[in-house]
């Protein structure tokens, strides 16, 4: 019997996913919502921010997989059926995220924004490099992606601390945990990398008070979700100089609105939510295995708890 997986994403092309998944699961057909016909037995969904009412059209679903590591876009939906929801946990996604974080941290550690500005001005500008061990990097969020990034930064020689909601232990990382540890963690972070999931507890966690706790001139990198940071407070801190710069891959509203002040701030680098994306050739294996598990009556791996948001 042939089953159907419905694929819904406004930013991901379906063809690579269709090819990868149908090669692994010959009895599953991958279809977009527009391709679904009366004879399709839709049992699985692979989605990224599907439109309102999407799930109500597919009452026989047995598994929903999110095209990414974050589940916040599905929290609170009234059309989501009572079926397992799984996130992607792909080594290639973790590697891609780590590369982006390393790029952003190295750019600040080696004073590249100052050299970029000097070049635009036609001015020779020397800043003596600091040793990596002298530069204090803080990774806010030590989950799968945050932990991998923190370990790579430590391997590169940076002085790395991490903060998480519950205690973690990572080799070479100065780990902090819980609300009382947040301000001391921020106070030692010259470069702050935000890697938290978006939950009710983390929404705007980095507001004016948290930003004020960072050292003056600190740099901020956000690769989590835009709403973890109070955007107005962020803009104010960048304008005042309390924050020396920001590398932002995520925003409260995406795409970032035309005319938003972040577009024209000289100390801000904007990228369009691409720090890490799912790679069909590698991630399809996890999706196929989870479909096999659900068929056999087992829970999928990397299941999301929507009450927590991750």
Q: For the regions a protein language model found, what residue spans apply to each?
A:
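Rossmann-like adenosine-cofactor binding region
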Residues: 166-261
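Phosphate/diphosphate ligand-binding glycine-rich loop within oxidoreductases
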Residues: 43-116
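Glycine-rich NAD(P)-binding loop of Rossmann-like domains
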Residues: 116-148, 175
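C-terminal helix-to-coil terminal segments
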Residues: 84-88, 92-100, 114, 169, ...
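Short acidic low-complexity segments
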Residues: 29-41, 52-55, 173-188
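Glycine-rich, N-terminal phosphate-binding loop of Rossmann-like dinucleotide-binding domains
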Residues: 49, 68, 194-197, 223-224, ...
């Amino acid at each position: 019997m042939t089953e159907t997986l419905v694929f819904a994403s406004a930013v991901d092309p379906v063809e690579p996913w269709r090819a990868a998944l149908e090669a692994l699961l010959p009895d599953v057909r991958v279809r977009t919502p527009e391709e679904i016909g009366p004879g399709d037995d839709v049992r699985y969904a692979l989605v990224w921010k599907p439109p309102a009412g999407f799930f109500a059209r597919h009452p026989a679903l047995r598994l929903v997989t999110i095209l990414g590591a974050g589940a916040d876009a599905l929290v609170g939906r009234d059309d989501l059926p009572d079926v397992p929801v799984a996130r992607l946990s792909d080594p290639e996604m973790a590697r891609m995220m780590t590369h982006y974080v390393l790029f952003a941290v190295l750019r600040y550690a080696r004073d590249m924004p100052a050299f970029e500005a000097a070049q635009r001005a036609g001015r020779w500008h020397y800043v003596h490099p600091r040793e990596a061990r002298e530069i204090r990097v803080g990774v806010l969020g030590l989950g799968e992606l945050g932990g991998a990034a923190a370990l790579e930064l430590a391997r590169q020689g940076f002085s790395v601390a991490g903060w998480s909601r519950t205690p973690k232990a990572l080799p070479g990382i100065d780990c902090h945990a819980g609300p009382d540890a947040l301000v001391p963690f921020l106070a030692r972070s010259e470069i702050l990398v935000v890697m938290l999931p978006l939950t009710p507890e983390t929404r705007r966690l980095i507001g004016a008070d948290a930003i004020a706790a960072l050292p003056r001139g600190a740099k901020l990198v956000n690769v989590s979700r835009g709403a973890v940071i109070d955007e107005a407070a962020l803009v104010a801190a960048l304008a005042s100089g309390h924050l020396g710069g920001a590398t932002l891959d995520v925003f409260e509203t995406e795409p970032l609105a035309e005319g938003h002040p972040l577009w024209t701030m000289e100390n801000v680098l904007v990228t369009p939510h691409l720090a890490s994306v799912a790679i069909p050739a590698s991630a399809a294996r996890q999706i196929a295995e989870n479909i096999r598990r659900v068929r056999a009556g087992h829970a999928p791996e990397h299941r999301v708890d929507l009450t927590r948001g991750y």
